């Protein structure tokens, strides 16, 4: 997601991938250590670090993106344009539901099973 959203902050990245901040911090640390991303301080708030892909990161992103696009096309084989649109809308709706539930849990609440 960093290649798709250069300059994203770590907290927003954690929200996007529905993970806790600690897990996101560990992943970002490993990506930085392996020179896939770089962190740059915000010009107005030095506590905020923006994440950017490096050349190495962009190089590995391309085949990953192609694989993802290919897998999506395979998943939608045999779907009409309308069926695909409907499926994407349903998946978007499911994603919103999951994000709301995750936000609830992230705030320390417990789910009622």
Task: Locate the predicted segments by residue.
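Short, locally clustered residues in the helix-turn-helix/winged-helix DNA-binding domain
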Residues: 1-4, 65, 92
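N-terminal helix-turn-helix DNA-binding core of bacterial DNA-binding proteins
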Residues: 1-23, 30
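Short, charged/polar low-complexity linear motifs in solvent-exposed/disordered segments
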Residues: 17, 28, 77-80, 103-106
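Short alpha-helical linear motifs
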Residues: 22-23, 75, 108-113
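Charged, amphipathic alpha-helical coiled-coil/dimerization segments
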Residues: 29-89
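C-terminal regulatory/oligomerization modules of transcriptional regulators
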Residues: 81-113
């Amino acid at each position: 997601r960093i290649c798709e959203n250069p300059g994203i902050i770590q907290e927003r990245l954690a929200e996007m991938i529905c993970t806790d901040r600690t897990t996101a911090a560990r992943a970002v640390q490993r990506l930085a250590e392996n020179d896939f991303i770089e962190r740059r301080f915000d010009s107005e708030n030095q506590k905020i670090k923006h994440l950017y892909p490096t050349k190495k990161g962009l190089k590995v992103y391309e085949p990953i993106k192609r694989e993802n696009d290919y897998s999506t096309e395979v998943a939608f084989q045999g779907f009409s344009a309308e069926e695909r649109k409907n499926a994407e809308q349903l998946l978007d709706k499911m994603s919103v539901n999951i994000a709301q539930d995750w936000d609830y849990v992230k705030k320390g609440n417990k789910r009622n099973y």
